[in-house]
From Swiss-Prot:
Keywords: Adaptive immunity, Blood coagulation, Coiled coil, Disulfide bond, Hemostasis, Immunity, Innate immunity, Pyrrolidone carboxylic acid, Secreted, Sulfation. The modification Pyrrolidone carboxylic acid is found at Q1. Heterohexamer; disulfide linked. Contains 2 sets of 3 non-identical chains (alpha, beta and gamma). The 2 heterotrimers are in head to head conformation with the N-termini in a small central domain. It is found in: Secreted. The keyword Transmembrane does not apply. It comes from the Eukaryota. Signal peptide: none annotated. The keyword Disulfide bond applies. GO terms for biological process: adaptive immune response; blood coagulation; innate immune response. A long coiled coil structure formed by 3 polypeptide chains connects the central nodule to the C-terminal domains (distal nodules). The long C-terminal ends of the alpha chains fold back, contributing a fourth strand to the coiled coil structure. It comes from Rangifer tarandus (Reindeer). GO terms for cellular component: extracellular region. This is Fibrinogen beta chain.
């Protein structure tokens, strides 16, 4: 479960990075 949460956070960060572009 913890790994899943971490994956979700990473996904959000990636999304933010793409949006920031």
């Amino acid at each position: 479960q913890h790994l899943a949460d971490y994956d979700e956070v990473e996904d959000d960060r990636a999304k933010l990075h793409l949006d920031a572009r």
